[in-house]
Amino acid sequence: MAAAEAAAAVGKQQQKGGGGRGGGGGGPAPFLTKTNQMVEESATDEVISWGKEGRSFVVWKPVEFARDLLPLHFKHCNFSSFVRQLNTYGFRKVVPDRWEFANGNFRRGEQGLLSGIRRRKATTPQSSKSCGSGVNVAFPPPLPPLPPEPSATTSSGNDRSSSSASSPPRADITSENEQLRKDNQTLTMELARARRHCEELLGFLSRFLDVRQLDLRLLMQEDMRAAAGGVGGEQRVQEHAREEKCVKLFGVLLDDTHGAATRKRARCEEAAASERPIKMIRIGEPWVSVPSSGPARCGGDN
């Protein structure tokens, strides 16, 4: 495989003269130097290479990278350990859907900037597994799952709305209590008006009767029965009002219509007496006008 041969060639070059570079003093860390060498090697561009602008590098084939390149440079084949090391030195992932990492001091052709990259915190050493017959490729945790489809979200929202609708909210109970309180106030006002009406009725009756001899409780019970009776109660009230307007003669009610007719007849007779024609009776000579003493007739009587 071309990638494996290129990796072997890079390993031989490092064993010849580049292994101890950056090991002490103020030089860059060995991890940064080895990573830069892997990215700069053009023979392995199909596995790992620089980005478009040379300010980041991309691991195109993580499996081949962990199997062929990591054992040559870091003596292990754990890709997740390599990613953790990058995070320790301040590298960040640029694109979510691929393994592209960047750091402000990690640029193409500018190895002198590697000394400016510092380790953020010490990590506990992890025992790397040897890459013997089988290659152990451990990848970082997968990316977070995609959001659910709209149909699932809609169904879950409907379930929440149905569950919330099953339990009545506190606002509905409060409004119902307020409505009951208003109804109670209305009934209290109607009762007060009924009592005032009863008092006014008693005051009116006191003009014609001795109210002190009346049993007020019986009157109130009768008034309640009349109100409950509906139309029958209204008729009894009308009869009671008619009795107040009429006059009793020896215990018998004299209808007001009869009185009106009597008054009308009396007025008619008075008018007839004033407008009655004088009959002329001839009693010899000369003519003498003698008024007739016969009864006058009303214009409406036959």
UniProtKB/Swiss-Prot annotation:
One of its GO terms (molecular function) is sequence-specific DNA binding. It is found in: Cytoplasm; Nucleus. Residues 16-28 have a biased composition (Gly residues). Residues 170-202 form a coiled coil. Exhibits temperature-dependent phosphorylation. Keywords: Coiled coil, Cytoplasm, DNA-binding, Nucleus, Phosphoprotein, Stress response, Transcription, Transcription regulation. A motif (Nuclear export signal) lies at residues 211-218. The keyword Magnesium does not apply. The keyword Transcription regulation applies. Residues 1-15, 151-172 have a biased composition (Low complexity). Pfam families: HSF_DNA-bind. Its main location: cytoplasm. Transcriptional regulator that specifically binds DNA of heat shock promoter elements (HSE). Belongs to the HSF family. Class B subfamily. This is Heat stress transcription factor B-1. It comes from Oryza sativa subsp. japonica.
